[in-house]
A protein has these predicted regions:
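Glycine-rich flexible loops
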Residues: 1-181
Length: 181
């Protein structure tokens, strides 16, 4: 099996897990996987996770953000491209729009997840813009996760499993901060 086929299979499995954990809804949120130094795969734009298939995952070139095929990549692919370009140690990215994080992102204050990890809040920019991608990429110079002001959360990790686990933990901790029992 080729690396592209393996990547499609793995990313598809984790995209379904991401949806099942309610960290994303409908077409909101996205997930990607670095294939090699030149390319990554990402979920498509405008396609509900319930309708997703491995063939709909989009291959994107890291150097310039160009994509291959007829299906458009997530509208936040600019953000993923900049993170992969600047952080060679990151192999997977999860961007969530989960309930508790949505609330906390509107407060625009950094917070602690677990006992040690602090996630900053990026400067506000409209979604799907180059400015949002630049603001998030700037925070990724020092952090592996960022709360996107009035938007959601994005985390980069060595694997899809690690990125999904961090995103899940962050949503739980956000609930604790909001006083959920």
């Amino acid at each position: 099996m080729s690396r592209l086929a393996e990547g499609r299979k793995e990313l598809f499995e984790y995209a379904l897990k991401l949806s099942e954990t309610k960290l994303v809804f409908g077409t909101w949120g996205n997930i990607s996987l670095r294939l090699c130094d030149k390319y990554y795969l990402i979920t498509p734009s405008g396609i509900d996770y319930k309708e997703l298939t491995p063939e709909l995952l989009v291959r994107v070139r890291i150097s310039d953000g160009a994509y291959f095929g007829d299906v458009k990549p997530s509208s936040e692919s600019k953000m993923h491209t900049l993170i992969y370009r600047n952080r060679k140690d990151i192999n997977a990215i999860v961007h969530t729009h989960s309930t508790n994080i949505q609330i906390l992102s509107s407060i625009r204050k950094p917070f602690i997840v677990g006992e040690k990890v602090i996630y900053p809040v990026s400067k506000y920019s409209p979604s799907s813009t180059k400015k949002l991608a630049l603001n998030v990429a700037k925070e990724f110079e020092q952090y592996n996760g960022v709360i996107i002001a009035n938007h959601g959360f994005v985390v980069g990790a060595k694997s899809l499993e690690e990125a999904l686990n961090i995103a899940s933990e962050t949503e739980i901790q956000a609930g604790v901060l909001l006083g959920e029992k």
